[in-house]
Amino acid sequence: MSHYHRQGGPGQPHDSYEDQQQPYYTDQAHSGYDHHSYHQQQLYHAAYDAAQPEYQAAPVKPQRQPSRIRSNSSGSRSVSHTPAAYTNQGIPPVPSNLSAARQRSDPSQALPPSSSSYAQDAFSRPSYSSHRNAPNAPNSNHPSRWDPNASYDTAPTAPLYDPAPLPGSGQLDADPSQHSIDLGVREPLYDDQVMQQHYPYGGAAAFQRSDSYQSGRPGAGGYHSIDDEKSIHSKHSNQPPGAWNAGAPSMPYNNMPTSHSTIQMAQPAYPPSPYGEYEMHATGMPEPNMSIAGLGAPGALIAAAPMPGMQHHDSTYSRENRERIMRKRTVKRIPLQDGNLVLDIPVASSISKSTTNNPEFREMRYQACTSDPDRFIEEKYTLRPWLYGRETEMAIVLTCYNEDDVLFARTMGGVIKNIAHLCSRTRSKTWGPDAWKKVVVIIVADGRKKANERMLKALGLMGCYNEGVMKDHVLKKPVEAHIFEYTTRVQITEKGEVKVTPCPIQVVFCLKEQNKKKLNSHRWYFNAFCQMLKPNVCILLDVGTKPTGTSIYELWKSFDKHHRVGGACGEICVDTGRGCTALFNPLVASQNFEYKMSNILDKPTESVFGFISVLPGAFSAYRYKALLGRPLEMYFKGEKLHSGEGSNSIFEGNMYLAEDRILCFELVTKEREGWLLRYVKSAKAYTDVPDRVPEFISQRRRWLNGSLFASYYAVWHWYRIFTSGQPFLRKLWLLFQVIYNLVLLVFSWFGIANFFLAFYFLLSASTSTEGSDPFGGQGAAIVEIFQNIFIAMVIVVLVCSLGNRPQGSNFAYTSAIIIFALIMGLALYAAGYTIYLALDAAGLTHTNGWRVDNLETLFKTSGFRDIVISLAATYVMWLLCSLLHLEPWHMLTSFVQYLFLTPTYVIILSMYSMCNTNDLSWGTKQSNGPATDLGGATGCNSKQDGKGEMVDVKIPTSAADAEELWTHYRQTLSQPTVEVKQKRDKATRQEDHAKNFRTNLVLIWMCTNALVVIIFTSTWWNKYVRNHIYAGAVRRGEPVINPYQSAIFWSTAGLSAVRFVGSITFLLLRLFGH
């Protein structure tokens, strides 16, 4: 086409009053743009949506920022005050990369970069290295003009382009004959009906927006009048009534020239902010993100949660409805962009209502990635935040496997609250109203067929997933991951409600085609996405872990305050349910106590040393530049080991079951760098813990094996402390920690023996005093019985651990836990009675007052001294530290449960993990081979000039299709989740049955043998023999032989005699020919 606009818009007369009175620039002011009312804008939205989108040329990002220069040149041509400013051309969607943007423009009439001052200033913020040292008032100190004649180095460092007019940017009016682009009319952003004072971040009453608002009451309602500041709004004496009813955000171009400026074709342009820029004054208010979006105030309900008794469609209806929607997809012929399938798909209008045509909120971007994550950039894949040229301060990754929508909503809700908190920090040098632009939330699902369907539909309701666009092959190349990008403004609550978020959230959803485990998910995060976004801080979360409202900020602050911090973690708390009802389960209560004491004793101690042995992957943070090099290289070495591509070392395989421990060690001992690890007490996150025995044992097997072998690795490589960049005193301090960890490792190795001996000595001490027996004179028999029961249960656990899955031996493991709890109770009773005997021996049980000589006698008693000191060093210290940390409640609610389940942690879990060091799995099965159920992007043997190879894809093409699919997702999620008991398939049941038969047979065999040994070696049997069977021999002084021994001897002789007789008989028969 010969030009890029059409005169007039549909239904708009060329000589309308507003067109005649609203030029691009006015002679009465130096503020930039004039504006039409909101209603004028709506007249052209239909034309914008109906037109075929056109791409603008993608400029090249210069190596230095020229945005502080503006032209004072007066040679620019004037702009015609005609309705030509309005075009029916659609808002161009975001070009996916540099090549594609160039290809979509006619080479003969290529569009130059936009001359919009809006675009010029979008990247005039301080550089990445110093942006935290500058106040969060964007572009406040820029010169007022950009010199179009300035020369720049055009070497491409990163593709940046000028997406079409976004909020408040207006439409471009291009004249290719002049090789320049004129500034278009800046359209209004607010409507009278929606311009309410919704302050998404709280406390906004103290702020005032920098807009001018004129509706017969200048300055009223907390807004500045036009006289208050140099606004972009000009004061027009001939302005028609109501023309300024809709304000627009103030832009920092305070001294714009009265004549119109153009930018020459060769000059670089900068992308405008996709959500508008606000100029913060001393009393300015945060950007009202959601009130301008058309969705309503933060927290506004878009779809209600399912109600009890609500009628629901059955699964057959939902399946048929989905198939009907999938059949409505249209086959489109589109060009590949740099050989990659990249699509911009409209999202449902229910979640994209807006007063602007911003493609960031109206379209979801999909990429079918066929490359390995290590080659993501090399294969020219891109991400939207990078295309927009945004600096990413924080990248938050949420890894998931098959978690449901409730767990996902819990985690995502916590993340959204944290980002909203960052936006509320208006006095921060880094954060503020636009903080959401510096945070990218990356969700990585481990396997398309393993992912929970309800979680995927929850992402679909947020606009971050559309199953209708996914392809499993692109030109016969299998797809490795499906990448969806969308800046969402809605969230799903745990109750199933769809609500407006406090601020927009940049989401990247990576759905891996195959299940390749968590390490591979982190490789996508670090080596693909972070390598492109270059975040300062990386936050790691597991779906199901819910950070509290300010936790992520607290983690980030530890990096911002201390430049040597390379990693940090917060406190992971057990989710005890509403009213702490989950604590009625002893398993949950014991884990709650274990987590609390670890966060009170272990983590603070290790943080003082500067080396935390493990930063839990469920909630931790790292400085990205600290991870580069050997730490990430060693971290991802475990992926090859678990996939069978690396060495066959069982030691390394178990070591990488706790790969986060390896990462921490490599980070602290990194050569020529002195990074430290910190524990941040104020950062908390809640997580679910196993509440059933099989899941609990399976989880701890991986943890214990990984931590044991990783501890060996850290102790064995202690010398690497001295090759790191740590200061000398820190090296000595870390060496002391290595010695401390070595002692803990030794105690862990002998844990079972130490526990048995402690139990044996306590019972022996309580029954050693003649005439004083805590068991009514049967102390010796009780000690012997329980000693044998202890040994028997160790044998039972050993046999079960050698071959049985916990899921197939639930009864055996549960019985062992109960019996060991009784043994622990008996040991505590014996310890208490021993202390009583010591008090009685010191005369303290019969006196009215304790004297010094009584206390001296008491502490000279070894039984009291040793037991009391050891118990006080443990239990009393727990209580004291809990009180000092102002967190004593777990001592009341969970201490007793943990006390009785201590043998489970020391014996059962340790034995099961040791017996399964050959199992290097994470409890999931890796799927192999590419899938072919989605359909692919097939070649059509045709090319279009400048557009590369064309492919045919079947996709939804309109917002109506997206809305229908969104409604289907909503209907499906409105059906309550049916609690389905876990069932084993036939093969697994047969395998478990065979293993149970083997285990039962071995146990019967071992137990009967042990029973014989126990009976005929017991003290009772020996007394019975001496007093009844051989009483006469005892009186005569003859030696007493155990009758069982005699029976064994005579039986052996008899059996030998039988064999002797048989052998002689055979010879005789052979002699006589038989």
Curated annotation (Swiss-Prot):
A Pfam family assignment: Chitin_synth_1N
Keyword DNA damage: no
Region described as Disordered: 1-32, 56-179, 209-255
Primary subcellular site in the record, as a coarse category: membrane
Gene Ontology molecular function terms on file: chitin synthase activity
Coiled coil spans: none
Family: Belongs to the chitin synthase family. Class II subfamily.
PANTHER family, per database record: CHITIN SYNTHASE, CHITIN SYNTHASE 2
Name of this protein: Chitin synthase 2
Native source species: Mycosarcoma maydis (Corn smut fungus)
Gene name per UniProt: CHS2
